[in-house]
């Protein structure tokens, strides 16, 4: 007869050995290794092994505001979230996972950039229709409960930059090249060169209409810059001259239309002078130095206006019409971006203090949600969240490698 208990013991031991061996491959050996390994384990666990797809979170409709309506289904593969995950895995020594995701992307997109969605199902599904389930009362009576996500229909310009950044990182890490990968990259850069002037719904997936978000324009610049870098550093073939010119045009446009000299900071969008925490990405992708006066002004303005109870909010919900009622918690990823910017600006002590404060928000098994409600002193939003764990691992590495932005760590020359 089959000894079920013996088989169960063997399965537990085998599972334990697998995860311990995987964690031991982490190349980070700094002060926060336990927290970094926990974050990397979360990212690995969010990966659907049959395809390599990486979900944003394993849950749906956990509220950003208890009792509110900002409840979303995150059980899908956002290209943005997945590319951030890929890059942090590469930086910590996990190349096979990056190669699997690269191959998943090629299968999922499988066409022109015009048809590229911002998100897919774990097996590459394209139809993710958003449906509300009114018979469910929701977590702590937070309704509606949703399955699917209408953001799948949005145009988000920044995604092209994030995909190009990740594919560049994969090439630099020595992942075996594929002809179809470079063909896709060329199509993406050409698409961005044609469409970077178009408004979009942006990284925060607003439901109030398209705008010329500064973050989106910066990431359009990233898309073209990484295409140029692929030609210059890896000998790929492409229209180098026209791409360099497009890169310069985008950068000039951001400085001319995205910066408010009177206010002393970059703006949320070309037509909206409000602040947005997504602006903190600018020095992290190599667009502008963190100690540039324009960026210093932006960092300080965000600290003044968007840091509430010690944590960074994406924007002022009361001022920035995003098409939704109610409020939300502070955004943990943006708070870690502030850590990165402070460190790059030479404010290491302040950066480290904030990092420790953020890391201490994790629960008893080291998990982080998307947001934190400082008034209720609890995590909110879908859980665990890839964004938050990516940002923790990235910031920990940055604090060990003082003065090196993520872009510079990937061998990119900052601020061309």
Stretch-by-stretch model annotation:
Residues 1-416:
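Acidic, mature catalytic/reactive cores of soluble proteins
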């Amino acid at each position: 007869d089959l000894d079920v208990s013996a088989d169960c013991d063997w399965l537990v031991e085998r599972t334990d050995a697998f995860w311990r061996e995987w964690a031991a491959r982490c190349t980070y050996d700094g002060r926060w290794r336990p927290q970094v390994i926990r974050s990397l384990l979360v990212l690995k666990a969010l990966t659907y092994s049959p395809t390599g797809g990486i979900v944003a979170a394993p849950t749906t409709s956990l509220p950003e505001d208890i009792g509110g309506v900002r409840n979303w289904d995150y059980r899908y593969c956002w290209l943005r979230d997945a590319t951030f995950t890929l890059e942090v895995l590469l930086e910590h020594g996990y190349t096979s996972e990056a190669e699997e995701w690269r191959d998943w992307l090629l299968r999922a997109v499988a066409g022109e950039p015009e048809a590229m969605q911002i998100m897919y199902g774990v097996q590459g599904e394209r139809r993710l229709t958003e449906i509300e389930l009114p018979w469910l009362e929701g977590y702590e009576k937070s309704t509606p409960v949703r399955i699917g996500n209408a953001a799948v229909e949005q145009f988000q310009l920044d995604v092209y930059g994030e995909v190009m950044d990740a594919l560049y990182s994969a090439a630099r890490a020595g992942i075996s090249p594929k002809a179809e990968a470079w063909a896709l990259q060329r199509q993406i850069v050409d698409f961005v060169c044609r469409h970077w002037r178009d408004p979009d719904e942006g990284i925060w997936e607003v439901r109030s209409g398209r705008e010329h978000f500064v973050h989106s324009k910066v990431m359009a610049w990233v898309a073209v810059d990484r295409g140029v870098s692929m030609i210059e550093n890896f000998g790929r073939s492409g229209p180098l001259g026209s791409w360099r010119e497009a890169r310069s045009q985008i950068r000039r446009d951001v400085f001319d239309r995205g910066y408010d000299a009177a206010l002393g900071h970059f703006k949320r969008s070309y037509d909206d002078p409000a602040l947005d925490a997504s602006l903190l990405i600018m020095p992290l992708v190599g667009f502008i130095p963190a100690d540039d006066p324009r960026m210093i002004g932006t960092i300080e303005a965000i600290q003044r206006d968007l840091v509430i109870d010690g944590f960074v909010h994406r924007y002022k919900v009361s001022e920035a019409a995003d098409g939704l009622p109610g409020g939300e918690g502070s955004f943990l990823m943006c708070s870690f971006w502030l850590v990165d910017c402070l460190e790059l600006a030479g404010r290491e002590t302040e950066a480290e203090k904030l990092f420790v404060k953020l890391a201490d928000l994790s629960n008893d098994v080291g998990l982080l949600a998307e947001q934190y409600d400082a008034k209720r002193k609890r995590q909110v939003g879908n859980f665990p969240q890839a964004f938050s764990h990516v940002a923790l691992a990235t910031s920990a590495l940055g604090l060990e490698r003082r003065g090196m932005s993520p872009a510079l760590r990937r061998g990119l020359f900052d601020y061309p």
